[in-house]
Amino acid sequence: MAESNTDSKSSNQMWGGRFASGPDAIMEEINASIGFDKKLFAQDIRGSIAHATMLAHQGIISAEDKDKIVHGLNTILSEIESGNFEFSRRLEDIHMNIEARLATLIGPAAGRLHTARSRNDQVALDFRLWVKEELEKTEKMLTGLIAAFLDRAEEHAESVMPGFTHLQTAQPVTFGHHCMAYVEMFGRDRSRVRHAIEHLDESPIGAAALAGTGYPIDRHMTAKALGFREPTRNSIDTVSDRDFAIEFLAIAAITGMHLSRLAEEIVIWSTPQFGFVRLSDAFSTGSSIMPQKKNPDAAELVRAKTGRINGSLIALLTIMKGLPLAYSKDMQEDKEQVFDAAESLELAIAAMTGMVRDMTVNTARMKAAAGSGFSTATDLADWLVREAGLPFRDAHHVTGRAVALAESKGCDLAELPLADLQAIHPDITDKVYDVLTVEASVASRKSFGGTAPSEVRKQIAFWRARN
């Protein structure tokens, strides 16, 4: 699919009737979008076929011209897909490139295709179709990522690890429970994707430049043919806004944020200092100078791509924020942001799905870490509330003294002699040691949504039924 700049005067054949001369070379360069909007060729052709079919059905063009147009458009589709189509920058965009080639193939009948249509509603349609398809693809990819986490959660429903706050040891949890946290996050992301598909499921074609058209078109017919629920209801809004693209970018940014947090954890967990997980060779790289290195580059690149996605969201919001209704050429700058973010998001989800499925979990290292840092201190406080009848604030204070004592002795809470604990509070008995193991700690957290293995398995079953 080569690009050419050599076809002189072709740039104004579609719209240049009132112009005495062609545009300056710099104007051609800044005005051209074919370098990136050629990605919309399939959507543009699909929309044109639906439009031509409707025009013929309504008696606006002849059936003979419609057949020529459809045959010509299918020929162009084959040319582009096979790499035998030469794109021209002087023809500005994908719409003009296809229409010019159609005129070469079928002659004057090509000029009837643009009846009751503007490039304003045409590009709104193409872009909306592309974003809709991308959202559907994202939904499927998120479903795959959720499935990968469900498998790991089931495998590790009882594997104890430290839970963190402030990246400091907080309480024991299970790795399965930690995995299910990401199932919830990516599940919400997928829900946002589904809602976005509902929001954009309206056909723009037929809005024309901004005011609609005087031709007796059937917008419901084209909407149905293109797989939309219904046509848009306001022609000015139809060509004015790109909130469907911004919503896609916002979803991509939120999803990217979740991916980035996970990537950060994988980077930390894979360090020798943590040693919780080991990435497979398939998702790691080495060093050109240090032979021993195995770097988590896939995770780091997922983390970085989130920055690109965030930048795309801010860019499009900034482009749109000051535009009066209806269409302005500023909106030509909408597509590159979305195309780039979509590519980054696809790569990030695919890479993360592979890492989650392939990584090796060091359960022994996780369990050992879970028992350090006085992670069962809350369990001691809860025991004092239940068994000694202390108010929680008093129990919290007593436990704090026990932690300070254990820290001064260089031991864990469970290693403190009973006499030492009773010196802090006389109602402590030897039964307290039953709650100071990490296994007992996680098993006790049976509240809805808690980390107890039994509760984790309930949540896995809930999500498997919905994934």
Swiss-Prot record:
Principal location listed in the UniProt entry: cytoplasm
Molecular function, one GO term: argininosuccinate lyase activity
Taxonomic placement: Bacteria, Pseudomonadati, Pseudomonadota, Alphaproteobacteria, Hyphomicrobiales
GO cellular component, one term: cytosol
Assigned protein family: Belongs to the lyase 1 family. Argininosuccinate lyase subfamily.
Organism of this sequence: Rhizobium etli (strain CIAT 652)
UniProt protein name: Argininosuccinate lyase
Pfam families: ASL_C2, Lyase_1
Reactions catalysed: 2-(N(omega)-L-arginino)succinate = fumarate + L-arginine
GO biological process: arginine biosynthetic process via ornithine; L-arginine biosynthetic process
EC number: 4.3.2.1
UniProt signal peptide: none
Subcellular localization(s) per the UniProt record: Cytoplasm
